[in-house]
Amino acid sequence: PDAILLITSAVDAARFAQKIRDRNQQVLLFASQWATTDRLIELGGKAVEGMVLHNYFDRESKAAGLARLRDVYVERFQREPGFAGVAAYDATRAVLEALARRESGEQLREVMLTRGPFPGAEDGTSFDRFGDSRRVPHIAVVRDGHFVTLR
């Protein structure tokens, strides 16, 4: 094949990448946000170099909210936040802000669907009618053992 899309965790994506690279050094590897964690690089090593990944936050962002989250997260967990940490932070902020914006008798769901965007680590988060968040997608590639956001 010319390319392979891995919709797996970081651990499985790293293992698959190693097996694939044993057989084909040239195939393009793509992975979902689920694999976009430091574990991918730790476990995958050279096999994940050049892998292209989807992400909903820019690891290189200079946004003040993301900088604050990074500081607190690193102090507590001794590592940078990944997609799950940022998503949990944004979800919590959205719910707390929606509760503050809610008027007496108003359903939280309705507030979250109609009163966004809500502040997040990088930018505001709003929700569609199904409750899915609307975010700016980012594409990253693994280069020299780091996720680099493509511009």
Region annotations inferred by a language model:
Residues P1-R151:
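Extracytosolic ligand-binding ectodomains
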